[in-house]
Amino acid sequence: MGGYELVDGRPDSGSLETFRILPPRGRARLLAPASGNELIGSYSTFANGRGFRGAAITSGLWAAVRLGQSDRVLDRRVSLVAHDGVEGSPLRELLESVLHTPDFSIAIRLTSGRPNAKLVVAAISPEGEPFCFAKLAGGPHVAELVRHESRTLADLAAIEHSMVIPEVLFAGDWQGVETLITTALPMRRLPRSAVTAHRASDDLCRLSGMQAAELAASGYWDRMKGRLATLQSSDGPEVGLIESSIEFVEDRWGASEFEFGRGHGDWSRANLGLAGKQLVAIDWERSQADVPRNLDLAHFALIDDGRSAGSRLLDVTLLERHTAELLALAGRSSDRAQALTALAVLEMVVRFAEAVSAGLEANDAKFGPLLRALTLRPVDSVPPSQG
């Protein structure tokens, strides 16, 4: 891509960039600059759980670098090598053109097993801080997500709101690859309660105006059924489960009136943080202007509980209770907790199915089984919160 390729080790000639591979064993997830603050900063930038574990690994990297042990601890390397006729690094030249400085190192996050897999590149300052992020789509499915995020950020930049969102530095085709480059936003991780985020999610719903409609008659539900039709036509995975789940939702809540407004689409700790008292929100590629109000809160509960559960199957009742608690923190009624939970889980199953249908390596070991458990279980009242 872009006139060069990745090769193992450090070749004798033609190397444009050299990276250390993190983690040092197992599947590569991050290509980090080879040394110093940039190496440490690249891990901190992409750790996505800026909690205890992320801090511990960052401390370990810092110690290895300062003690001169990085070559021994991080012994896997890969290099970017230019194709014949290519001079310099086209990717570096692109980043230099938007940053107006050559003083940075490149870090690359490798994503697989996810429904939005793409290369994410960071330009890291000599002090180890990110200057910007570049998303490079690897195919038509992801290219549309990248284009959609570019449009969403432009729309949000044109209206008044209280969130801090990335500024677009470049958006469009670059050497045949749909690309989005945005500013990197400094943010500290959300506290455990994350009340600021929960309240902001309800404010976000109103940004594009709100409308009320029966679920089955809404544009949102038409789009969901259209996605199912596309999967059916391409013999996509989990079609039977998605069909039965859509019937399940329509039978129980299709005639119920919902409010619809702007949703982020991936409202989770990995994409949210704080800058002072303001909420920072990144990664808007799944945002839509007509989703059920507070669907983001159900997604937040789903991702939070999923990380806590590890490889264990999530408990449907506990997940619904968590959604109800987040609704209460946002000042909203918990009446829709069950419906929103079902819609959040269905959305994730559809995303993974769409990715697999598009030829991506997307492994859903969690949401499909959860959706089956949810649709086979009687619909009762949401259990009361335990505090």
Q: What is the meaning of each model-derived region?
A:
Residues L295-G331, V345-A358:
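Active-site activation/catalytic loop segments of kinase-like enzymes and analogous catalytic loops
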Residues A117-R147:
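ATP-binding glycine-rich loop module of kinase domains
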Residues G2-G3, V7-D8, S15-L110:
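Juxta-kinase regulatory segment immediately upstream of eukaryotic protein kinase catalytic domains
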Residues E167-V177:
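Short beta-strand micro-motifs within the conserved protein kinase catalytic domain, predominantly
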Residues G176-M187:
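Conserved short submotifs of the Hanks-type protein kinase catalytic core
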Residues E149-I165, L185-L231, I242-E257, G265-S268:
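Conserved kinase catalytic-core helix
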Residues R312-R321, R351-G387:
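ATP/Mg2+ or Mg2+-diphosphate-binding catalytic cores
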Residues K118-A123, D251-L295:
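Active-site acidic catalytic loop and adjacent metal/ATP-binding pocket
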